[in-house]
A protein has these predicted regions:
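Conserved RecA-like P-loop NTPase ATPase core
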Residues: 31, 158, 194, 210, ...
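C-terminal beta-strand of the catalytic ATP-binding
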Residues: 197, 289-292
Length: 292
């Protein structure tokens, strides 16, 4: 039977071939806090405490998965997003801080407005829809998804959200076409999406834990048409029931920011479109307003 301190030392040694020492320390700490159900302060004080056989087995299984580049969020089965703790699995993207920035922008701009109707296109884990439903409780939020795995994961997150009547409504369908999913939508005030936007040629620069484990369907745009989903979104805005001067909020590929902006500034039903920076200063988001 090993102590917390001894397995920390051994795990850091094993992980050092793939991760920086700081990354490895963080991963080991998170695993131990989860497995032992203790806080960071308690972990610091538990260096000489022994692990039981089950805890040790669980820990080394997780370390082995880390050595195969598996994201720790998939290993743990959950990920934070704002004040939410979301179930995640390989069928959905792991929620990113940039996406949380986009959600915070929407909340800041629309807080206090009542009767909002919001559509999240390609909801994945449901992170955007749930964040907005939680922070804008007077809004009615709809979430569209086509992937079987993602639908199941989003529904699980919706069911456990505790939001009651504010829980998003999950719609099954494809954002590339207006199907039966659109028939029950009220006039929308906001469309939001974090669609696939990575170009396949960018794969060589991506971290193995993303490239080897997260769903390519949600990551990559078609090589022949990297702005496919953005054109589809502005076309949806022309075909779905929309309020006058409704808003569109999108996460995008900073390498294609100007091209993405051009898609919207050239659309006849778009009154205005603007790029917004993320916290690192990159053009990461687009906001557009429909004609009044």
């Amino acid at each position: 039977m090993h102590t917390v301190g001894s397995i920390q030392t051994e795990a850091l040694s094993r992980l050092s071939s793939l991760y920086t020492r700081e990354e490895a320390r963080s991963l080991v700490r998170i695993l131990l806090e989860e497995i032992l159900s203790i806080s960071r302060t308690q972990l610091f004080m538990a260096s000489e405490s022994p692990l039981d056989e089950g805890q040790e087995e669980q820990f080394w299984e997780a370390v082995e998965r880390l050595l195969h580049h598996e994201p720790i969020q998939y290993i743990l089965g959950h990920a934070p997003f704002g004040a939410l703790d979301l179930f995640v699995a390989p069928g959905v993207l792991i929620p990113r801080p940039e996406t949380e920035e986009l959600c915070a922008t929407i909340v800041e701009r629309h807080r206090g407005q009542k009767g909002l109707h919001i559509l999240d296109l390609g909801t994945g884990s449901g992170c955007i829809a749930l964040y907005l439903a939680q922070m804008l409780p007077q809004a009615e939020v709809f979430a569209l998804e086509k992937s079987d795995q993602a639908v199941a994961i989003a529904q699980r997150n919706f069911d456990r959200s505790g939001l009651g009547s504010s829980t998003p409504q999950l719609l099954r369908g494809d954002m590339l076409e207006v199907g039966s999913w659109a028939s029950s939508l009220p006039p929308l005030d906001i469309i939001v999406s974090n669609p696939p936007y990575i170009q396949p040629t960018e794969a060589v620069t991506m971290e193995p834990h993303v490239l080897e484990h997260e769903p390519h369907l949600a990551l990559f745009a078609p090589e022949s048409d990297p702005l496919l989903f953005y054109r589809a979104i502005y076309q949806l805005a022309a075909r779905l029931p929309m309020q006058p001067s409704a808003h569109i909020y999108l996460e995008l590929n900073a390498l294609l920011a100007e091209d993405t902006l051009a898609v919207f500034t050239e659309a006849p039903h778009i009154y205005s479109a603007t790029l917004l920076p993320d916290l690192s200063g990159k053009s990461r988001f687009l906001t557009a307003t429909l004609t009044p």
